[in-house]
Curated annotation (Swiss-Prot):
Modified residues (Phosphothreonine): 21
Gene: SAMHD1
Cofactors: Zn(2+)
PANTHER family reported for this sequence: DEOXYNUCLEOSIDE TRIPHOSPHATE TRIPHOSPHOHYDROLASE, DEOXYNUCLEOSIDE TRIPHOSPHATE TRIPHOSPHOHYDROLASE SAMHD1
Binding site for GTP: 104-105, 125, 130, 133, 440, 444, 512
Binding site residues for dATP: 137, 152, 198, 203, 301, 304, 308, 355, 364
PROSITE patterns attached to this UniProt entry: HD
Binding of dTTP, residues: 137, 152, 198, 203, 301, 304, 308, 364
Regulation: Allosterically activated and regulated via the combined actions of GTP and dNTPs (dATP, dGTP, dTTP and dCTP): Allosteric site 1 binds GTP, while allosteric site 2 binds dNTP. Allosteric activation promotes the formation of highly active homotetramers.
Phosphoserine sites (modified residues): 18, 33, 88
Alphabetical list of InterPro entries matching this protein: dGTPase-like, HD/PDEase_dom, HD_domain, SAM/pointed_sf
Disordered as annotated region, ranges: 1-41
Protein name as catalogued: Deoxynucleoside triphosphate triphosphohydrolase SAMHD1
N-acetylmethionine modification, residue list: 1
Amino acid sequence: MQSADSQNTPKRPRRDGSPRTPPDSPLADAETSPSHDLDPDYRTWGPEQVWSFLRRCGFSDSELLKRCREKRMSGSLLPFPEDLGISSHGKKMKLLNCIQDTMKVINDPIHGHIEFHPLLMRIIDTPQFQRLRYIKQLGGGYYVFPGASHNRFEHSLGVGYLAGRLVRELSEKQPELQISERDILCVQIAGLCHDLGHGPFSHMFDGRFIPLARPEIKWTHEQGSVMMFEHLINSNGLQDVMKYYGLIPEEDILFIKEQITGPPESPIKDASKWLYKGRPKEKSFLYEIVANKRNGIDVDKWDYFARDCHHLGIQNSFDYKRFLKFARVCEVDNMKHICTREKEVGNLYDMFHTRNCLHRRAYQHKVGNIIDTMITDAFLKADDHIEITGSAGRKYHISTAIDDMEAFTKLTDNIFLEILYSTDPNLNDARMILKKIESRNLYKFVGETQPMIQRIKKENYEHLPNEVASAKPSDVELEAELKAEDLIVDVINMDYGMEDKNPIDHVRFYCKSDLSKAVMITRNQVSQFLPETFAEQLIRVYCKKTDEKTLFAARQHFVHWCLINDFTKPQIKKLPLRKLKKELTTATG
């Protein structure tokens, strides 16, 4: 049994950056640290909550903040600016407006009760952001997983919230980083707005439809997000609101856009050159929170792992809250990067494994993918006959709406129903495809294979249907003539997020003995059970015709094509075992 004295003996301080690490400054003191979540009733706030609130509202006056702490002012004084030492009429009005616009609380099924700054709420309450309510997060996956009815709207809220969590964790843990309230707000806005540029059915639009409808351009939803963000700010007059809350639009709008798209293109490939303009090199770590171009560990993934798994009914094995507790900024090659404890390396491999599993089980589900393909076919046939009104009354099609953000604001998943219920004879072909989806009369899966040696290059994808159609076995009599237009060849690249590279090679870790020194951990130091390769390619073939004769011909062509190209043994769609053996035996002679 412990004595009373031993029970009162303070525990040995931890040196790993965890919450029990002794505070380095008054800001980090456990008794005085401002909470992440302020109670909506400001009258209950203590001095530190008032201090945090004033900072969030853009009051950067050091004397005011110092006085607030020294006199231990409570929230009950906020309606009386003079008692806080605020004499300027403009600042009085700003404070009173801030009180009216205190943090809004939203009940999210993934993260619980989450708070948003008034400026974030002004962004959320715009037509450009509300549009995300009508874009399915997983596109055609909803037709396979009935629970996957969630949209880009709630995912964006989650990413904005987590971005704030991570940057505040770093700020409170390492005050020497000098993370300002401006920085925090900008990171949250970038998280909130990172998916504004998604089109109907999310990745189907920029991954399948636009490359076929407009092959001459390279357009991504990240580019669309930046364009839509600019449109959102300008059309809703939010520059003045940003200034009101302490931002500098000339600098901060650029910083927000850079977090979404990455640095500008440079003809000189020099890793040591700082290409960003929104924030200096000393704050390089801020660019690793929303969309981490360095190693892919970012809050975007954390939210969609948790949210997608919740709606798909799949177990999520990655806990972002643990990463938050061990995240620290260390210097690596004269740059500041977000690092984690060396003991967390196994959990990070689990994170990337979770991503790979989600792609295998859900994102690249063969039925979900073919539904995306059918919707793409329908949109291509409807493209010239759909008109969307944009700025100055100009008309745009589905594929050209990306050139005008006023038109793009009106383009959501609802275009599916517009085509489906249209009586326009020009939309007959597109309408028939969508009716097939509704009645589950889908293109038929023929088979799946993998290249054994060399992966198929993207520029060769369009030639694959012709290759399969031409691969007619000479020793098999077929009753149907197969044409290239009857086939869909879907090439899927599965990886850990960095093509064939190991993403952990781009992560740095710190040890308990030295919190400031970043180290690299090689794959062999972790486990012998980790993957040897980090990327593979799957090739799936589908047939648009559903009669037995054409499907039999398609299987024969597919098997012969695999043999010609020395691909892996083809996996054929469910056939009776005897019939499958007979087909393979016939094809191989």
